[in-house]
Amino acid sequence: MKLRVATRGSKLSIAQTMIALEAIKRVEPSLEYELVIVKTRGDIHQDKPFTAIGGKGLFEKEVNLAVLEGRADIAVHSLKDVPSAISPGLVLAMTPPRDPPYDVLVVRGGKEKTIWDLPSGAIVGTSSARRVAMLKHVRRDLVFKVLRGNVDTRLRKLEQGQYDAIVLAEAGLKRLGVDIEYWRIPPDILPPAPGQGIIGVYTLSSRSDILPILEKASDQKAMAEARAERAFLAYAGGGCHTPLGAYAELRGNTLYFHAALASPDGSRRVEVRVEGDPDKPTQVGLEAAFELRRLAAREGISL
């Protein structure tokens, strides 16, 4: 069996793709593959915020186009970069085991400091509206500055003194094997983006030749969490401008779901917690989204 695999060409994207392929090879040892590298607008315009060049879905659409046009059999994504409405004809077919979904704080000098240890006026680098608003909710005295580029570039900018601290996804550091000191930000303070830590493999819904193999290779815990979070995202709405976090966790026979929404300036925040049947992840996600929309309307926070 040979698969043509669409992916971006960054170190992190390639690392994620190899994780997915290794999971497939465990159930299909004869697997051969060819990488179809796609250069997206997000890769070209790294000096601009996501919101200025397309926002959520910036990386997803052009990679998926390779599958839709028949140039690739599957596309591999970091699921948090995939909007709730994907290209028609594609399905989420496989997820390897989930990496840590959390965000982390990296402080210049390699010291493991918490958000509470940063001095007033400290400059924190991130381009995420979710991270800015949620952290402003607990530390309104911090200054947030746009940060783009790959992980190496972001860490270099930190050490050059452009920032006092930066916020990164823990999963990215793990996948790249980056060994640095950091503080894992508790999800009660900063709930992850929906899909964070999950690698998603997409293919055409008509590919009956490879769908059974991908399903067999998929981690069922990660898939249940992914389906709950994506159902939540689809109903809750919001895009890259929306300070929205959500995280499902399957523990034992229960699927737990935590979500929060903040106003852009961080002055207001609402959150919900629900739990339900792990065999009905979509229902759990929709229940959380319905409750969050109700609370947001009551508090006057826009989605």
Curated annotation (Swiss-Prot):
GO terms for molecular function: hydroxymethylbilane synthase activity. Keywords: Porphyrin biosynthesis, Transferase. It comes from the Archaea. Binds 1 dipyrromethane group covalently. Its cofactor is dipyrromethane. PROSITE patterns: PORPHOBILINOGEN_DEAM. Belongs to the HMBS family. This is Probable porphobilinogen deaminase. It comes from Hyperthermus butylicus (strain DSM 5456 / JCM 9403 / PLM1-5). The gene is hemC.
